[in-house]
Amino acid sequence: MANNEESRGLKSLFDWFANRRKAGATNPERQEREIADGLWHKCSKCGVLTYTKDLRANQMVCVECGHHNRVDSDERIRQLIDQNTWRPMDENLRATDPLQFRDRKAYSDRLREMEDKLGLLDAVKTGLGQINSSPVALAVMDFRFMGGSMGSVVGEKITRLIEQATQRRYPVVIICTSGGARMQEGMLSLMQMAKISAALERHRDARLLYIPVLTNPTTGGVTASFAMLGDIILAEPKATIGFAGRRVIEQTLREKLPDDFQTAEDLLKHGFVDDIVPRTQLKNTLSQLIALHQPVPTTPPMVLWETMSLSSTAAE
């Protein structure tokens, strides 16, 4: 098995070098520098080396084994939203440190480090846009920012997005990836579960569509709240989805869990998600679902109305 993976990886590498030789001679030092600079990506599942440009063209899905690599919020928005239609919301909301929380370092220092490293103020981006010309309110969680944990800013931004969608009568799509509620904010982070759920209930009362997309991983308080409240719940292949961690459950039950436990495929089998959609098909799938749930026009077509009027006149 390992030999086959190495062979596939070497074949891909040789093909690329062969193409480069056709385009023009390069020296070994330049080739090594290009690999080190991120021109190549090694799949964590099958070990195949893929030209990063080709991997991005395939939405960061391994062309050999189909493994879905983790992507950031900007890449998600690029993949899903029609060009030049994205309008971000609440970009300047920033977390505070009301508990003066400190573990190995102060929470305020962690927030500052994340901002400096990633250019993000928190773990979600929200906004309005279009998916194949259909308007949508979209929230995209970003696992790079403190494990995608849900704090007061994440909760507030998602709640405001849902309220705006309800007012505009837009469907809501949330791309979920999270380790759960943010412990550094204590009860304030747990309150976001109820706040978002209440906003979604008002959205549902208005007979509007909500679709969560569960990606790897979706766990903790996010799973226990808005991730599982969708009208239609989608998941990416092989995504880890659950509440408590696998090791915690095994230690509590003192039992060995099945290999597919807490996977998207296992949840689909037991009815917790409605479908598993490969990332390359996600935009079109969302577009079709949104189109199917558009409200039926209440005004009769003009031709039908004219026919009814003529019939009424003739009868008189």
Swiss-Prot record:
One GO MF term attached to the UniProt entry: carboxyl- or carbamoyltransferase activity
Keyword annotations of the record: ATP-binding, Cytoplasm, Fatty acid biosynthesis, Fatty acid metabolism, Lipid biosynthesis, Lipid metabolism, Metal-binding, Nucleotide-binding, Transferase, Zinc, Zinc-finger
GO process annotations (BP): fatty acid biosynthetic process; malonyl-CoA biosynthetic process
One Pfam family recorded for the sequence: Carboxyl_trans
Catalytic activity: N(6)-carboxybiotinyl-L-lysyl-[protein] + acetyl-CoA = N(6)-biotinyl-L-lysyl-[protein] + malonyl-CoA
Chief site of localization: cytoplasm
Pathways per UniProt: Lipid metabolism; malonyl-CoA biosynthesis; malonyl-CoA from acetyl-CoA: step 1/1
Keyword Repressor attached: no
Residue span, CoA carboxyltransferase N-terminal domain: 39-308
Residues reported in the UniProt entry to bind Zn(2+): C43, C46, C62, C65
Calcium recorded as keyword: no
HAMAP family noted in UniProt: AcetylCoA_CT_beta
NCBIfam families for this protein: accD
Family: Belongs to the AccD/PCCB family.
Subunit (UniProt): Acetyl-CoA carboxylase is a heterohexamer composed of biotin carboxyl carrier protein (AccB), biotin carboxylase (AccC) and two subunits each of ACCase subunit alpha (AccA) and ACCase subunit beta (AccD).
Name of the molecule in the record: Acetyl-coenzyme A carboxylase carboxyl transferase subunit beta
Natural source organism: Trichormus variabilis (strain ATCC 29413 / PCC 7937)
